[in-house]
């Protein structure tokens, strides 16, 4: 039996409790969220979220442990992990494709008969594209450059330099999130105020969630770098984080151009001659 197990390059996964607990956490999160949306208590949703975070921590801790023992993650397994990350990002692209479809369905008459003749709809005051959104664009583009520098540093075996540039990237990610939160707090429209606000918050909010996840991903990479988990030849976890961060950058460029810039370009102040 031992010889047959070592006669292939695949990782035979040990029994794990995390898939089962994760499914329970997902169920509690979903039902708790629905319950809260129908004027119920938010605590079931928060409990499900906390349980899911615990599962994520434990499961990823085990994966990192498997990677560090030097036996489980063969070249074939690493190739599979890379393919899995690419497919995961592809599935995320489909998510955002749906949000952009909803946005253009509401704005472009050539696509939908239900599209608004005036966009943004009358009464909606959109954000100035070249205010906070443009600043956030510069921040994310800069963070894309800093994470690339960090990648080059680890490729050359410079763990100290990699950690330093990762810190820069994390700080930029936190700055983006803070500015996004400031923008939401000072918005003149709420999520349920119409099709404009719904598509706006869905698209930008989902992206903001990805920025938070990506920032956490990079923070984990920083601590793994400090512990010596990454070398010039072996840093798959860092590669996955960098790919994810670049994906977040690209999505934001589309959001800035389509939702903020083009989507808000038709706004006419109420005191202009158009409304008279």
Question: Where are the regions that the model predicts?
Answer:
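...captures the hydrophobic TM-helix bundle architecture rather than a specific catalytic motif
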Residues: 1-276
């Amino acid at each position: 039996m031992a010889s047959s197990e070592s006669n292939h390059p695949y990782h035979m996964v040990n029994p794990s409790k995390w898939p089962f607990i994760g499914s329970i956490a997902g169920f509690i999160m979903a039902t708790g969220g629905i319950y809260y949306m129908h004027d119920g208590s938010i605590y079931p949703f928060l409990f499900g979220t906390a349980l899911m975070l615990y599962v994520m921590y434990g499961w990823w801790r085990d994966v990192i442990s498997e990677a560090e023992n030097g036996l489980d993650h063969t070249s074939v397994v690493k190739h599979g992990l890379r393919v899995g990350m690419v497919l995961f990002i592809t599935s995320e692209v489909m998510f955002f494709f749906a949000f952009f479809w909803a946005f253009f369905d509401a704005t472009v008459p050539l696509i939908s008969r239900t599209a608004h003749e005036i966009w943004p709809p009358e009464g909606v005051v959109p954000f100035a594209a070249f205010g906070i959104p443009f600043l956030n664009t510069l921040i994310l583009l800069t963070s894309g450059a800093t994470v690339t520098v960090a990648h080059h540093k680890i490729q050359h075996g410079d763990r100290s330099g990699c950690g330093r540039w990762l810190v820069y990237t994390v700080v930029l990610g936190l700055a983006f999130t803070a500015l996004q939160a400031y923008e939401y707090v000072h918005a003149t429209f709420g999520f349920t105020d119409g099709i404009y606000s719904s598509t706006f918050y869905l698209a930008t909010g989902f992206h903001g969630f990805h920025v938070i996840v990506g920032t956490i991903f990079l923070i984990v990479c920083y601590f793994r770098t400090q512990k010596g988990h990454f070398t010039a030849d072996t840093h798959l976890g860092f590669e996955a984080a960098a790919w994810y961060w670049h994906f977040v950058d690209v999505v934001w460029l589309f959001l800035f151009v389509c939702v903020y810039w083009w989507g808000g370009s038709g706004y006419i102040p109420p005191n202009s001659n158009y409304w008279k």
